[in-house]
């Protein structure tokens, strides 16, 4: 259910794009992200920092898209967000000796310390590559194709990555 909730702004963006076009869809994405954060704050009293980052990025890049009437900015938004995630993973590990992947998932699964480190690096690389793929699609395909990729392609890549990661991690998981 959380996965679908996380997709809420993307799904609304997709639907709004199909009905009204990129500029209305961009405004919808900004509002949907605000609503998502308000709901999380109301229900859980604590909003994940990455949701705040997402709101900041969608507001800045979406706002630029709307003010300048240029869809290039909203097309850069996923890449900037993916790269921000990648930088956060690497900087938290190198500068603060904190593994964010372990901090997020450590209560659900038990892994050797070295594997947590590898997992963090693999996620950072994945986000860099996904950002590059987003730019490739944004600059080489139509806006309609990019919007389809944003919902189906990027989400599909994430699902395949998580399944592959789960298979790889299964051999390291300690029995409880």
UniProtKB/Swiss-Prot annotation:
One Pfam family assigned to this protein is IspA
Per UniProt, which keywords does this protein have? Cell inner membrane, Cell membrane, Membrane, Transmembrane, Transmembrane helix
Q: InterPro entries recorded for this chain?
A: YciB
Among its keywords, does the record have Disulfide bond?
no
- Organism superkingdom: Bacteria
Q: What is the predominant subcellular site recorded for this chain?
A: membrane
Transmembrane regions listed in the UniProt entry = 24-44, 49-69, 76-96, 119-139, 149-169
Which GO terms of the cellular component aspect does the record hold?
Answer: plasma membrane
Keyword field contains Membrane: yes
Q: How does it sit in the membrane?
A: Multi-pass membrane protein
User: Where does it reside?
Assistant: Cell inner membrane
- What's its job? Plays a role in cell envelope biogenesis, maintenance of cell envelope integrity and membrane homeostasis.
Q: Record's family?
A: Belongs to the YciB family.
- Could you tell me what this protein is called? Inner membrane-spanning protein YciB
Organism, per UniProt? Paraburkholderia phytofirmans (strain DSM 17436 / LMG 22146 / PsJN)
Gene name in the database record: yciB
């Amino acid at each position: 259910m959380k996965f679908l909730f996380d997709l809420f702004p993307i799904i609304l963006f997709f639907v709004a794009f199909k009905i009204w076009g990129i500029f209305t869809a961009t405004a919808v994405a900004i509002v949907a992200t605000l609503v998502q954060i308000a709901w999380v704050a109301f229900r859980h009293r604590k909003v994940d920092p990455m949701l705040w980052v997402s709101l900041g990025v969608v507001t800045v890049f979406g706002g630029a898209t709307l003010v300048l009437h240029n869809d290039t900015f909203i097309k850069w938004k996923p890449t900037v967000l993916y790269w921000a995630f990648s930088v956060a993973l690497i900087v938290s590990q190198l500068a603060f000796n904190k593994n964010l992947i372990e901090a997020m998932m450590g209560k659900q699964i038990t892994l050797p310390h070295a594997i947590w480190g590898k997992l963090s690096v693999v996620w950072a690389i994945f986000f860099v590559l996904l950002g590059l793929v987003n730019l490739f699609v944004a600059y080489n395909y139509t806006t309609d194709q990019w919007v389809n990729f944003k919902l189906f392609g990027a989400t599909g890549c994430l699902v395949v990555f998580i399944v592959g990661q789960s298979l790889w991690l299964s051999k390291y998981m300690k029995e409880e």
